[in-house]
């Protein structure tokens, strides 16, 4: 088992032993099982899948860092939302609005970067819900 702690600035999001986790890093996805080599990696905005008691849970992570050492995985994130706590209708509306804003920001670098960040967050939330419904 892996001891997983996911911490946001204002709360502990997850603190328990798990069987497996799949994270979105800046260079792609990484799967972590017990006895994994020590790793420190940056996390991209995206989804995380956690397996506990042969059941998968899905969460949207808003970027951060992960450190694994000696079967202890600590994840520090800007924010996180469990798929079960995300309202589908609100997430869908936020995604569509973010997509429109990203298209409208084209040509203005500063607005484009800000809009891309909002779009990636909205997309991660929607993907977390969609993936959770398939598990």
Curated annotation (Swiss-Prot):
Membrane-spanning parts: none
Task performed by this protein: Produces ATP from ADP in the presence of a proton gradient across the membrane.
Location(s) in or outside the cell: Plastid, Chloroplast thylakoid membrane
The organism's taxonomic lineage, starting at the top: Eukaryota, Viridiplantae, Streptophyta, Embryophyta, Marchantiophyta
Keywords per UniProt: ATP synthesis, CF(1), Chloroplast, Hydrogen ion transport, Ion transport, Membrane, Plastid, Thylakoid, Transport
SS bond partners: none
UniProt-recorded name of the protein: ATP synthase epsilon chain, chloroplastic
GO CC terms: chloroplast thylakoid membrane; proton-transporting ATP synthase complex
Keyword NAD appears in the UniProt entry: no
Membrane topology note: Peripheral membrane protein
Native species: Marchantia polymorpha (Common liverwort)
Molecular function GO terms recorded: ATP binding; proton-transporting ATP synthase activity, rotational mechanism
The organism's place on the tree of life at top rank: Eukaryota
Subunit structure, as described in the record: F-type ATPases have 2 components, CF(1) - the catalytic core - and CF(0) - the membrane proton channel. CF(1) has five subunits: alpha(3), beta(3), gamma(1), delta(1), epsilon(1). CF(0) has three main subunits: a, b and c.
Pfam families cross-referenced by the UniProt entry: ATP-synt_DE (PF00401), ATP-synt_DE_N (PF02823)
Family per record: Belongs to the ATPase epsilon chain family.
NCBIfam families: ATP_synt_epsi
CDD domains: F1-ATPase_delta
The keyword Nucleotide-binding is annotated on this UniProt entry: no
């Amino acid at each position: 088992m892996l001891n997983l702690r996911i911490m946001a600035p204002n709360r502990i999001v997850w603190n328990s032993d798990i069987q497996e986790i799949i994270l979105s890093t800046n260079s792609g996805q990484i799967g972590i099982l017990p006895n994994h080599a020590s790793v420190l990696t940056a996390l991209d905005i995206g989804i995380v899948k956690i397996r506990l008691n042969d059941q998968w849970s899905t969460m949207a992570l808003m970027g951060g860092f992960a450190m694994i050492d000696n079967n202890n995985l600590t994840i520090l994130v800007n924010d996180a939302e469990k798929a079960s706590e995300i309202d589908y209708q609100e997430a869908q509306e936020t995604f569509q609005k973010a997509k429109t804003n990203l298209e409208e920001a084209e040509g203005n670098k500063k607005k484009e970067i800000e809009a891309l960040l909002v779009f990636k967050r909205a997309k991660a939330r929607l993907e977390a819900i969609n993936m959770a419904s398939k598990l």
